[in-house]
Amino acid sequence: MGTQPARKLRNRVFPHPHNHRKEKPMANDQVPASKCPVMHGANTTGQNGNLNWWPNALNLDILHQHDRKTNPMDDGFNYAEAFQQLDLAAVKQDLHHLMTDSQSWWPADWGHYGGLMIRMAWHAAGTYRIADGRGGAATGNQRFAPLNSWPDNVNLDKARRLLWPIKKKYGNKLSWGDLIILAGTMAYESMGLKVYGFAGGREDIWHPEKDIYWGAEKEWLASSDHRYGSEDRESLENPLAAVQMGLIYVNPEGVDGHPDPLCTAQDVRTTFARMAMNDEETVALTAGGHTVGKCHGNSKAELIGPEPEGADVVEQGLGWHNQNGKGVGRETMSSGIEGAWTTHPTQWDNGYFYMLFNHEWELKKSPAGAWQWEPVNIKEEDKPVDVEDPNIRHNPIMTDADMAMIKDPIYRQISERFYREPDYFAEVFAKAWFKLTHRDLGPKSRYLGPDVPQEDLIWQDPIPPVDYTLSEGEIKELEQQILASGLTVSELVCTAWDSARTFRSSDYRGGANGARIRLEPQKNWPGNEPTRLAKVLAVLENIQANFAKPVSLADLIVLGGGAAIAKAALDGGIEVNVPFLPGRGDATQAMTDAESFTPLEPIHDGYRNWLKQDYAVSPEELLLERTQLMGLTAPEMTVLIGGMRVLGTNHGGTKHGVFTDRVGVLSNDFFVNLTDMAYQWRPAGNNLYEIGDRQTGEVKWTATKVDLVFGSNSILRSYAEVYAQDDNREKFVRDFVAAWTKVMNADRFDLPRG
């Protein structure tokens, strides 16, 4: 939980973001508000769009984000190459200088911006959740709604404005995503912590993400019972990792604003686990985050203006204008809680645990009316000084989440060790901070810069380096051995697909590299059909063992899928080359944190026409979810579905959607028959349909909703019609191979990106 935590804001403090702009008098030549100029025909506010008219329509927008039309950078711009030209040492020096270069428009507490910068970085990284890999700091998304206007992010707009001169100076070589995390890390370094390291590589996006589900609430900080299915505080709705809308983790005043440290401890444990933190890391991050900086609540709610997205144009993207006195310094308003945690809030020390363990604590209200814990008795010299006048001292504070660190038995035991062993605490925190700020950056192969730690950490999903090469002749020889092994096209394609489909473009985890499909837990996932998988792996392992030179099983799995596809295309009369680039390694079980891979388990896969069970979300929506996480477009999704069906890759060998009499041949039959008006569809059970001859009624095929959506949705049908055309049979094969290759290489960060 970050310093100066703004996660406890109530609606009484910061209202729901409406349009706060007041009506301005019109000039004589202005059109009255009740009229709309003819030239304003664009739907510029998002009102009355198609989804307003048909709210249940399938929304394909999540597949069409972050394209060239929204990106101001030149074609061919490569951020990784640009970052490698950055003078990182100079940036770090500038950040160290910034920490104590207080600006009159937003003065630094005690003359040091460290606490503010840490909170900014924390709240950027802290949105990450392991369930779907979304959120986090790797895209610089804190610049955009809703995050730039969350109640928990009050006044972080000022932190980013303070960084603007540095961003402006280093330009394209330094993304906002990298700068935000580096600023937080340098803040700790400037206050005395020996940091673990820093890696660049966060490439900025240029508009808000459309795919991230932040919750169903329509009100900031709505009661947390919206997110829990029962009284059990472990039942937080998946994939969410915050207890209320607009918070990063927990409400530090207590559950729904009601102080109870033991109840809050349950929320802390659940939310931190949702981002893959264990109990020791949780205590370290909580304590380390609150060793420096302060909370701000020395104002009244009615004096605070709207958030950035609701503020007037003259605010220029800033929000929460404070009309209380100067509105800054000791009168700053952020979370509603008021005070610092430690005696020396601008230096790294063990003061947090000293405060917790050496005082009794009682509940009080801040000037803004927020619950906070204050010491019953405290020596004057142990109190932190005022942010403006060092001759004035104030009581330190603790949030309900801080009290959980000594009230929860497990947390208390960890806290006691950290108190006894400050060096150990600093070491654990430094590594936990690195994990927090790099968890969504992907494997170590994506890390950039001279400060990357040498140590391999298990949460980075390490893969051994590859020390072999394969010639074209050797690749051909391996293909021939695989095709002559007795394995079918379906078996080879299914195994390669299952190995690669775990890739998530959100946090760059999963994929075929590493061949973790042969390890726990993946080898026993029902979606991977363990019996079929074991059969295929045994054959490929035999080929691997008897080949004349080293080759990874990861490469053989992908090569086998590609060889099978080339054969299936040739059986249909089309010769095609399925690109294959060796270089994948084989991870070991010791390199694999089995528990951390559980969220990657496919419990649905429309590409293989499979659901582990019935879900409240429709099958076609689940298909979009998987497609978006895999980084695929709607046309790529369409061509892959059509190809996978005719190749006979359905889970369990079902025939739903297999609209062909030539199973195993890569053809466009799926689209030809789907769009043929000689057939008529009718329901035949739960998520099942029959296609029959329109004249005789004879049943020809069966299908699921995932199959039929490519004929019913107007956008998807337009793609299906392209691939059904007589002149696009070869195009279908080419496009299928291109999309397939993209999936197989999604986690090959060693390859050039084009």
From Swiss-Prot:
PROSITE patterns: PEROXIDASE_2, PEROXIDASE_4. Optimum pH is 4.25 for the peroxidase reaction and 6.5 for the catalase reaction. It comes from the Bacteria. It catalyses: H2O2 + AH2 = A + 2 H2O; 2 H2O2 = O2 + 2 H2O. The active site is at 106 (tryptophan radical intermediate), 123 (proton acceptor). Formation of the three residue Trp-Tyr-Met cross-link is important for the catalase, but not the peroxidase activity of the enzyme. Residues 1-29 are annotated as: Disordered. There is a cross-link at residues 122-249 (Tryptophyl-tyrosyl-methioninium (Trp-Tyr) (with M-275)). Residues 7-23 have a biased composition (Basic residues). Its EC number is 1.11.1.21. SUPFAM superfamilies: Heme-dependent peroxidases (SSF48113). Keywords: Heme, Hydrogen peroxide, Iron, Metal-binding, Organic radical, Oxidoreductase, Peroxidase. One of its GO terms (molecular function) is metal ion binding. The record marks 119 as: Transition state stabilizer. Homodimer. Bifunctional enzyme with both catalase and broad-spectrum peroxidase activity. Also displays NADH oxidase, isoniazid hydrazine lyase and isonicotinoyl-NAD synthase activities. This is Catalase-peroxidase. It comes from Synechocystis sp. (strain ATCC 27184 / PCC 6803 / Kazusa).
